[in-house]
Regions:
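Conserved Class I SAM-dependent methyltransferase catalytic core
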Residues: 19-97, 102-104, 108-111
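Hydrophobic alpha-helical scaffolding
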Residues: 36-40, 67, 150-157, 216-219
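Conserved hydrophobic/aromatic beta-strand scaffold that supports enzyme active sites
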Residues: 106-110, 128, 198, 248
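Short hydrophobic/aromatic beta-strand or adjacent loop that forms the aromatic wall/cage
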Residues: 104-108, 125, 141
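Short glycine/proline-enriched turns and hinge-like loops at secondary-structure junctions
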Residues: 100-104, 120-122, 242
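DNA target-recognition patches
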Residues: 1-25, 195, 199, 219, ...
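Non-catalytic DNA-recognition/assembly elements of restriction-modification systems
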Residues: 166-238
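Short loop segments at secondary-structure junctions
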Residues: 112-116
Length: 248
């Protein structure tokens, strides 16, 4: 609905520099460099409005589709968000978190808006976590932790409690014991894509990649990407693996 989209900066195309129009004039909401879109993802409009309505000095936790964190088509939206808020924490959720109702991969963003006269910090530490156990299966049935004998206990097999405790410690004293689940990244070290996906900064994953890259230093060994082997190769996951575009 154009009457709704024109109320949002995200309802318009960004300019060549990647900025969105500021919507201030009730009588001419489509003024400026932005071109009104035909449609827009509701979650992006929701994100914009949440940040707009957040008072200076306020904090917010918001559940969003995981793709917002690193999808290249969303880079301008991430840039807009980072220019207005400090990202306190990013937590990616297990695929069963909202099952059996939906299997959409989601994340939680914790944002804080600086006081009115304060700029958004240029560099700071971001708490990051990857939830790998949510205490239930895809049907919504509980999954319990096992004891040392392999028998089910009365405790759910989940790591959200651990993540919450680590984040509380991080907020209270500015540090915590990092693990495969919880770690940090620096705002100033975000790549050109402004990637906010914790997986990209996982110590476990990066240690593995570093081990693989060392093979490049060995005689008769070479490390390269699949795309460098054949530019026509496409990789699909799940049921799309049998696509004609896939080279195995």
């Amino acid at each position: 609905d154009p009457d709704i989209l024109k109320l949002f900066g995200f309802g318009h195309r960004p300019d060549p520099e990647g900025t969105f129009p500021t919507i201030t004039d009730d009588d001419d909401r489509d003024a400026g460099h932005g071109t009104l879109l035909i449609r827009q993802a509701p979650e992006l409009l929701f994100l914009e409005r949440c940040i707009d309505w957040l008072k200076p000095g306020g904090r917010i936790g918001i559940v969003l589709p995981k793709g917002i964190l690193d999808n290249r088509t969303y880079i301008n939206y991430r840039r807009w968000m980072l220019s207005r808020c400090k990202v306190d924490a990013v937590v990616t959720l297990h695929k069963n978190t909202f099952e059996p109702d939906t299997g959409v991969r989601t994340c939680v963003l914790f944002l804080s808006k600086p006081l009115e006269d304060d700029p958004v910090p240029g560099d700071y530490t971001i708490f990051m976590a990857q939830s790998r156990r949510v205490g239930k299966d895809s049907k919504g049935e509980p999954v319990f932790a096992l004891d040392e004998k392999g028998s089910a206990t009365s405790e759910l097999d989940e790591d959200l409690t651990q993540i919450a405790e680590a984040y509380k410690t991080f907020r209270d004293i500015g540090t915590f014991t990092e693990s495969e689940t919880c770690f940090t990244a620096e705002r100033g070290e975000l790549d050109d894509n402004l990637n906010l996906n914790p997986q990209h900064y996982s110590p476990e994953l990066n240690a593995t990649l570093e081990k693989v890259s060392k093979f490049d230093d060995k005689p008769d060994w070479s490390v390269t990407t699949i795309g460098q082997l054949d530019k026509n190769i496409r990789i699909y996951m799940g049921p799309r693996w049998s696509s004609r575009s896939l080279v195995v």
